[in-house]
Amino acid sequence: MFDRYGGDNKTKLPDLEKMYLDEDGTCGIPVLNIFSLLSAENTPSVAKRFYGKQGRDVAQGVKSFCNIEATEGTDPMFAPLNDETGKPWLSTDGRIKIMNHVARLPKGIPNPKSRPMIPSGWTCTFRFDLQQNVLLNEATLKAMIEQGGILGIGTFRPIFGRYSVEWIK
């Protein structure tokens, strides 16, 4: 499920433009969103949720010593989402559904939301390179990537955006 930021708090994007798209209209996940999932300090990232007092150091290890790249597509900073047959998801695909619901803000104000959702079965691939350092080791990074699947990626987590990891050497 996607809810891409439009650039300011007043801009309301059309539903299908809330997805992350490349210049060809292929849906995908920006590499920066993976960094955020693993190490953000202002949202429930893996480092914050699973690593307690060590979370800051682990997050710093990800940000300072880990390189993440998409392994498919033309832009190493954007990982195309593929369907179960390996075809890229395009924003024009009729299988993409618009989900409508009401979010409740802390003061109880109803906030109607409308977000595009790609059905389960999507795949994307990333390459993770970790430099030797004292803050983060390979085993912890692998665990963090897998724990990210519990939190989920995108919005309305962890109900949506959960994933599992398949390691490729």
Describe each PLM feature range.
Residues 1-169:
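RNA-interacting cores
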